[in-house]
Every structure is written in C-alpha cells, then in structure tokens.
C-alpha cells in the first residue's frame, strides 16, 4: 500500500490574515520588498501518513522520525542502501537536504518482503513511462502501479516499480500493460528480487469480457430545459 508524505512547501505564508490586514494598511507607505520581508516565516515539520487500506490513513509523523522543522518543497524516494525498502530524500529551501533511512527491514525482517519491477521499453519510450503494473498475491490482495517517476516539485524517484509485500514470499501473478497495449504475465514470482521486464517480449493479451454496468453520468439536458 502506498503511504503519503507531505512537505510543507512555503517559507512565507502569504495567506496569513494578520499580514493581509497589515499589507492593506501599510502598502501606500512601504516598498514591495519591505512588505515581502514582513510576511511571517515559520518553519514547520512535514507530515507522514501510513496507508491502512480501505482509503484510511494513520498520521505517523512522529513515529517515523520526521520531526525537524523545515521549508521543504520537493521529495523523492529510492532504495538507497539496496536492502529492499524505500528510503526518503527531501529538499529544503536555503538549507541542506534531509535523507531518511528506512529501517523496517532491520526491525521486522520477516514482515518486510518486497518485489521490484524494472521496466525496459522500446526505443520511443525506453523507461516505459505510463506502463501499468499489477500484482496479485495472498488473500486476493492486489497492488497496482502506473509508472511515472515524478513526485512533487522538480523531484523524480527511482525508476523501478516497488511493491511492499509484508509476510508474502511469493507473488501469484505480475501483469504488465505497456503503452503500446501489449502486455506480459508472470506467475509465481518469488519475493525479494528485481524482475526485469522488456517490452520487446510483450504480446497482445486476451481480455475478459466484462458485464456492462449503468454509466456514472446520465444526460438530463432535456429534463432541465
């Protein structure tokens, strides 16, 4: 499941109500630079939320050690130490970047299985941008990943689809659909490895016919005149 980390982003709060009132009364006698310098500037910490599933999240900022106040406006994650979990790097305005090591593998070695899927596309899309990766594993669980590396302001993550599996040691099915429409399916893939998938080996996959359901939107133009 995908967790969420939110960077605070702004060194100066232009929506501060006291500043808005102050600007209205002082704008005629102060230069623009003087007004900008008077905007409140307070560092605050970033926020982290753990995905519990079913669209529910727990706020885990303190528990995950994200406590340092900062002005952060970009972030990326990658397995920097190649131990199987994703580490986290955040850019701080006018300050050093922060690097956070993920210790879940060291703390819970039997509950930290993973699968990495590395894509190699064709000559027109070497990285495989836009490819759809879906895995199915224990208890009918599924995870999906639409491959795009961009995260936040001027930030890019490791070009690998990373799936945390918990205690699961074998993935029943890995399905990749490329932008070309072709796809590949892999069965019974062992955890804790990197699966290299090349579009050159993709084929047209059969599609199951799904029952048509009522559309989400209905045309009521005539009713409303």
How should each PLM-predicted stretch be described?
Residues 2-3:
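Active-site regions of oxyanion-processing enzymes, predominantly non-cytosolic
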Residues 6-7, 90:
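Residue position within the beta-strands of beta-propeller blades
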Residues 7-8, 177:
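Conserved residues at the C-terminal ends of beta-strands
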Residues 10-40:
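Short, conserved, GDST-rich strand-edge loop motifs in beta-rich repeat architectures
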């Amino acid at each position: 499941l995908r967790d969420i980390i939110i960077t605070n982003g702004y060194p100066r709060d232009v929506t501060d109500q006291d500043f808005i009132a102050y600007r209205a009364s002082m704008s005629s006698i102060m230069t623009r630079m003087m007004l900008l310098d008077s905007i409140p500037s307070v560092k605050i910490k970033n926020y982290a939320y753990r995905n519990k599933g079913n669209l529910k999240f727990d706020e885990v900022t303190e528990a995950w050690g994200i406590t340092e106040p900062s002005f952060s406006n970009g972030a990326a994650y990658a397995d920097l130490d190649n131990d199987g979990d994703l580490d986290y790097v955040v850019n701080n305005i006018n300050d050093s970047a922060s690097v956070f090591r993920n210790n879940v593998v060291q703390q819970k070695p039997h509950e930290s299985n993973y699968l990495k899927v590395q894509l190699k596309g064709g000559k027109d899309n070497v990285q495989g941008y836009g490819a759809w990766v879906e895995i199915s594993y224990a208890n009918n669980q599924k995870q999906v990943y639409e491959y795009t590396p961009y995260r936040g302001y001027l930030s890019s993550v490791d070009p690998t689809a990373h799936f945390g599996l918990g205690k699961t040691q074998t993935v029943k099915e890995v399905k990749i659909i490329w932008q070309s429409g072709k796809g590949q399916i892999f069965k019974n893939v062992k955890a804790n490895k990197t699966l290299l998938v090349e579009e050159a080996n993709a084929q047209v996959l059969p599609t199951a016919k799904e029952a048509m359901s009522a559309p989400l939107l209905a045309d009521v133009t005539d009713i409303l005149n």
